[in-house]
C-alpha cells in the first residue's frame, strides 16, 4: 500500500501516538501503534511506517465524491443565470457555510456511498440524502450533513481503535482535498474523532509530496538518522500549520449524527436491493 507510507511522511506522522488522515475521493486513517491490537479486526488493516513501526489503518472507499456531485449541481444552477464560477471559490463558499449549521445537522442525514463499504457490510452503495418532515432543511445544514457523511464510515472504524482498543493518539494530521478550505474539514474531523487535528500548509500535496520527501531522506540523511528525526529536523522544522481542538458541542452533534446513521443503515440496504 504505497499511498499509506507516503501519506505518513507527507504529514510527518511516522512516530508512535501520531496519526494521519488522507481525505479525497476515498479516505483512510493511519495511527502509529505503541503495541499490537488485542485481537484481529476485519475492519482494521495492519501496515507499517516506511521504517517499520506498526500502524493500524482504517480504509473507506467513499469520501468526497458525493459532495463533489452536489457542488456541480449548484454550479449548473448558477450557470442557468449566466454566472461563471471559479470552482475552488465555489467549494470554499459551500464548505464554509457548513460551519453555520446546527451541530447535529438539524436532523438531516446523508450516505456518501458511491460504492460499497466493508466497514458496514455493503458490497455496493447508493448515494442517498434523507430527512424527516421535522428536519431543519437549509443550505448550512445540508452542506454540514454532506461533510459529516464524508467521515461517517471512517468514524465507525476509528471508534474500534480509539474506544475499544484505547489506542492513544496525541494528534491527527489531515491532508488531501477535504482540508483545502481552511478550518472546515479540520473542525469536522476533530469533532468526529474527539481528537485534536492539525493541518499543515502542505495539506493539499498528498502522496507525491511524501514520495519526494522519502527520496530526499534516502539521499541526504546522516548516518543512523531515523526517519522521524530527519523529518522533524530537516523538513518540518518551522513548518506552518494550524491545530484545532474539538468543540464539545460539535462532538455531541457528530455523535448524534453517527448514531442516526448507524440506526438507519437498513435504508441503504433497501436501496441497494431495490434500486438496480
Predicted regions, residues:
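Active-site core segments that coordinate phosphate-bearing ligands/cofactors
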Residues: 1-173, 178-276
Amino acid at each position: 500500500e504505497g499511498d499509506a507510507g507516503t501519506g505518513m511522511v507527507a504529514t510527518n506522522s511516522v512516530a508512535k501516538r501520531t496519526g494521519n488522515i488522507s481525505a479525497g475521493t476515498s479516505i483512510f486513517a493511519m495511527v502509529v501503534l505503541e503495541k499490537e491490537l488485542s485481537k484481529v479486526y476485519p475492519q482494521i488493516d495492519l501496515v507499517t511506517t516506511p521504517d517499520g513501526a506498526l500502524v493500524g489503518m482504517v480504509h473507506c472507499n467513499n469520501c468526497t465524491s458525493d459532495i463533489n456531485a452536489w457542488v456541480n449541481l449548484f454550479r449548473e444552477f448558477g450557470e442557468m443565470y449566466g454566472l461563471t464560477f471559479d470552482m475552488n471559490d465555489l467549494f470554499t463558499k459551500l464548505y464554509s457555510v457548513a460551519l453555520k449549521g446546527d451541530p447535529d445537522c438539524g436532523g438531516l442525514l446523508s450516505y456518501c456511498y458511491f460504492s460499497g463499504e466493508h466497514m458496514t457490510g455493503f458490497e455496493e452503495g447508493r448515494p442517498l440524502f434523507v430527512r424527516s418532515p421535522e428536519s431543519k432543511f437549509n443550505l448550512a445544514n445540508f452542506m454540514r450533513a454532506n461533510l459529516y457523511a464524508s467521515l461517517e464510515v471512517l468514524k465507525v472504524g476509528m471508534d474500534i481503535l480509539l474506544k475499544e482498543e484505547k489506542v492513544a493518539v496525541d494528534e491527527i494530521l489531515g491532508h488531501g482535498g477535504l482540508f483545502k478550505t481552511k478550518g472546515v474539514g479540520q473542525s469536522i474531523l476533530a469533532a468526529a474523532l474527539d481528537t485534536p487535528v492539525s493541518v499543515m500548509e502542505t495539506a493539499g500535496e498528498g502522496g507525491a509530496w511524501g514520495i519526494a520527501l522519502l527520496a530526499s531522506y534516502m539521499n541526504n540523511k546522516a548516518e543512523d538518522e531515523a526517519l522521524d528525526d530527519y523529518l522533524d529536523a530537516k523538513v518540518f522544522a518551522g513548518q506552518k500549520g494550524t491545530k484545532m481542538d474539538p468543540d464539545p458541542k460539535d462532538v455531541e452533534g457528530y455523535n448524534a449524527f453517527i448514531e442516526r446513521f448507524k440506526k438507519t443503515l437498513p435504508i441503504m440496504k433497501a436501496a441497494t436491493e431495490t434500486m438496480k
